[in-house]
Amino acid sequence: MFQLRNFEAIKIGLASPEKIREWSRGEVKKPETINYRTLKPERDGLFCERIFGPTKDWECHCGKYKRVRYKGVVCDRCGVEVTRSKVRRERMGHIELAAPVAHIWYVKGIPSRMGLLLDMSPRALEKVLYFVSYVVIDPGDTPLTKKQLLSEKEYRDYLDKYGNRFRAGMGAEAIKELLQEIDLEKLSKELRAEIRESTGQKRVRAIRRLEVVQAFIDSGNRPEWMILDVIPVIPPDLRPMVQLDGGRFATSDLNDLYRRVINRNNRLKKLLDLGAPDIIVRNEKRMLQEAVDALIDNGRRGRPVTGPGNRPLKSLSDMLKGKQGRFRQNLLGKRVDYSGRSVIVVGPELKVYQCGLPKEMALELFKPFVMKKLVDEGLAQHIKSAKRMVEKVKPEVWDVLEEVIKEHPVLLNRAPTLHRLGIQAFEPVLVEGRAIKLHPLVCTAYNADFDGDQMAVHVPLSMEAQAEARFLMLAANNILKPQDGKPVMTPTQDMVLGCYYLTADEEGVPGEGKYFSSPEEAIMAYQLGYIHIHAKIKVKMTKEIDGVKKSKIIETTVGKIIFNEAIPQDLGYVDRTNPETAFDLEINDLVDKSKLGKILDRVYRLHGPTKTAETLDKIKELGFRYSTKAAITVSVSDMVIPKEKEKLLKEADEMVSKIESQFRRGLISEEERYESVIRTWNMTTEKVTEALMASLDKFNPIFMMAHSGARGSKNQIRQLAGMRGLMADPSGRIIELPIRSNFREGLNVLEFFISTHGARKGLADTALRTADSGYLTRRLVDVSQDVIVREDDCGADEGIYVEEIREGNEIIEKLADRIIGRVAAEDVIDNEGNIIVRRNELINEEEAEKIEKAGITKVRIRSLLTCKSRHGVCRMCYGRDLATGELVNIGEAVGIIAAQAIGEPGTQLTMRTFHTGGVAGADITQGLPRVEELFEARKPKGLAVISEISGVVRINESKKRREVIVTDEENNISKTYLIPYGSRLKVHDGQVIQAGDELTEGSVNPHDLLKIKGIFAVQTYLLQEVQKVYRLQGVEINDKHIEVIIRQMMRKVKVEDPGDTSMLPGELIDMFKFEDENKKAIEKGLRPATGRRALLGITKAALATDSFLSAASFQETTRVLTDAAIKGKVDPLLGLKENVIIGKLIPAGTGLSRYRNISVVKKVNDQQERQDKEKEETEVKASN
């Protein structure tokens, strides 16, 4: 029995004709499919039952044997074996070709493998294969050379001249003979010698040929197997033929393609039997070659074969390729049973870990469980009657359903699933109606809203799946974002507004200054309407301190008392050891969205997920209740237009006319005029906004919404009641006429027209961005999917130094943010010599704060960039798992998490290329395209000139050009750099610079940086540049996620000189493999290879992975498979995708072998007793 768990690796290779015949159950001789009268398959045809198995379970073709009892009998009349019809999905047939045919993948691929082996150009090869020219196979004693091409006329002339003294042929037969004659070992030696001696183009060609030759030697494939004598026919159920309603048939394109091959093959056989003239036979052979080409890869050569309506037919290659191909459509993602989908509605009454499931959906999803329970409880006699009960929906079914779904979590998923929080587990609660109820706090993680979104429900069936859902995926356990470790379940919108209103205070409201003997009394007074919720009151607080009751009067409001009931009172906001502050409320000031986030972060750190979930639910209750009680609403009169607006606009007009007159007098240029006008209007807009914000009352509903972080922003208020300001035209250039009106006054026609540009651009941008961001995520996942935490400590001594990231004077990322949750690579010592953190210890928040306070500017931490693990990474180099706050567990799929962390916020990044206020010079790419440019390691737009040597700068400006000369006095070398027109210099005369420093503004080409400054510099540069793009958009991503990707981009070494190893010059090889090969060589006393680390873009890195399954399912499927087959590649199944494709458990999380092979011990005590007993027995024996 073939068991999925039983194999470790999967190998691909070329199939020999013998192998194909071995797979086959019989030869397909006729092009017929099924008989039009009986609708039964024709014998020896493409659907023949004798070859492929019966169409009906346990029934032969002629009907002599029916029923299971004849299992395995081969019918003596029709020759069909009696078995399950399922075998028609796995049994193959074959076609014996009358003439050999070349496999198009190896002829037309780039580079053409067959051409390289034979040292023929692809064009020459094509001429021979498609019967245009003859090729000399054996020149004999004639002046011809082997593999020389001869035209029809030349061939006839030579034939007349030399007769049978030479041999030439055409078509695949000739090529097959040439391939059979190749002596691979001898050719390999010759090519290695040629590589050592030659240079230039000749050497490159020799290296490429050697690569193919070496592949054939290593894999044990024979070159002549690239020519097909036999063609395999895939099982009929994989190319089905189905009857439509109208009595017509729909068939897979493959059947058409196979039929053409069989027809042409049969015709060729007949012609050969008849001894037809050579030219006719040749034409038929060419047509057969073309038919087989179309079957294998239609459209690769010449015009594709089309079906009805000029649609190209889908060949075998198309079955694998692309989003609809076998890999991505059926192997990586399948449709699953026990699932449903429906619209979502809000469920504010739910707990964080619950969701509302519609009754009828739940009944359908849990049907088998309900049926079993009905039988167990004696409500039904057997499963069949139980099924009938469920289908008729008898009343007792509902009670059973209630019991069944208790403690049985379900998974909810919303598409698009951009990160792992897009699928979470909940405990179902049955609800009436047909909509799924969703807890409002998980909306942020799902990016869901209730305007018609739909969600899918999945039921985990096995006990393991249920346990996993409950412990790892339950919404209450996923409170922190894996991106940055901040809480993802922060209250939003109404809840924030309610808490803000609750904790506000107001002057001169009823009940101000009153005293109360206890918080309860104050709350009662509020409920009876004696005091206002915002009134400042004095309350006596009583607490037990060291067993003694003490009390103190504090000033607060009823709202704050109510709010604090929901918050644990030991978060450290108040110093409880100080008698002065010991009685204060934990939160005694105004609470907005960011404050709520910080409170929850503390609750999580101090009390863990369960308490946090409780607190969240309490805050949710309060928020909703008090935003309703506050009755905050928006009306036109809330948009107060500031009185100063007129005056400010007048001043601006005067400024602009001054600028215009200066321009007319020729004092300033057009550029300067434009810039000054823009600057003036921007300043005016700012001033109007400031005046507006100052004039708004602090209880103005619009102000409250924006200020609390519930909805809207300062920017939007400005447009409602201030002025809309400057707009951009379609090209992105700012129009110098601002929109003076706001939405309350209304815009005039021209203003409205100007503002349509921005709106339209915004929509187009969003659509493009979503697609680009999705594709970027897919590439990131593919490059990093096999990065899994595989060991505790890789033992790396080195780490990297980190310091804060700055852009000019602005700090983009603080040092503390970069080191929290990382492991120190060396002791961190302050100025007094005290050790703050020891080597190999995790740095937490308090320690990071201490380090910053001690004035330490750079810290050496363990990093993924220096991790020594061969496959995946180790726990110490990764540090804290951001979603739990603990050191990462072995088996965590950190690669995928990294890809999701970088890809998910991708949609928020802007697309636009900023035009620097009309300054001539290169546009700096920003946003998503910049991230892509960095990860693909492309030569950036707006390239900066960088210095290749360290030294002193001298700037030489003449009328025609600007030069920067860098001189290194010590080594006596100098380099001159020509500065392109319009670039801004970053250096000044006499400045001392280091190699790799930028001379002009712009982006650095990472490949140049790698050459000049080395690996560490380029890794740091990529990390910091990616961080800059995200931070400027206000998105926080932890460094370690970006490090995972950069690590994958730099895994390969490019071999420069192979020495005496088996590597090839220019080959890309994994750095660990490179070290191994060299170790082996040195041990044998041979010359080791030299090479340099290569920087690959993510697409290239994903295709260069060891796993051909992963690469083939990513992009360029045919190229990857062609290459893998020739090399006889073995896929070690280390990554996630490969294992999903072949249907094994993924080697991450609970799928790791160390977690799978566990024996459960019933009771610790029993085991302990047994061990003690054994110990005693051995002691007794020893004493005897």
From Swiss-Prot:
InterPro entries: DNA-dir_RpoC_beta_prime (IPR045867), DNA-dir_RpoC_beta_prime_bact (IPR012754), RNA_pol_asu (IPR000722), RNA_pol_N (IPR006592), RNA_pol_Rpb1_1 (IPR007080), RNA_pol_Rpb1_3 (IPR007066), RNA_pol_Rpb1_3_sf (IPR042102), RNA_pol_Rpb1_4 (IPR007083)
Pfam families named among the record's database cross-references: RNA_pol_Rpb1_1, RNA_pol_Rpb1_2, RNA_pol_Rpb1_3, RNA_pol_Rpb1_4, RNA_pol_Rpb1_5
Signal peptide (from-to): none
Record-listed Zn(2+) 2 binding positions: 794, 867, 874, 877
One BP annotation, GO: DNA-templated transcription
Cofactor note: Binds 1 Mg(2+) ion per subunit. Binds 2 Zn(2+) ions per subunit.
Essential cofactor(s): Mg(2+); Zn(2+)
UniProt binding sites for Mg(2+): 449, 451, 453
GO molecular function: DNA binding; DNA-directed RNA polymerase activity; magnesium ion binding; zinc ion binding
EC number(s) from the headed UniProt entry: 2.7.7.6
Keywords of the record: DNA-directed RNA polymerase, Magnesium, Metal-binding, Nucleotidyltransferase, Transcription, Transferase, Zinc
Residue positions binding Zn(2+) 1: 60, 62, 75, 78
Ranges for region Disordered: 1165-1184
EC class name: transferase
UniProt-listed NCBIfam families: PRK14906.1 (NF011498), rpoC_TIGR (TIGR02386)
Subunit architecture: The RNAP catalytic core consists of 2 alpha, 1 beta, 1 beta' and 1 omega subunit. When a sigma factor is associated with the core the holoenzyme is formed, which can initiate transcription.
HAMAP family the UniProt entry points to: RNApol_bact_RpoC
Record family assignment: Belongs to the RNA polymerase beta' chain family.
Function: DNA-dependent RNA polymerase catalyzes the transcription of DNA into RNA using the four ribonucleoside triphosphates as substrates.
Protein name, as recorded: DNA-directed RNA polymerase subunit beta'
Provenance organism: Thermoanaerobacter pseudethanolicus (strain ATCC 33223 / 39E) (Clostridium thermohydrosulfuricum)
Designated gene of the protein: rpoC
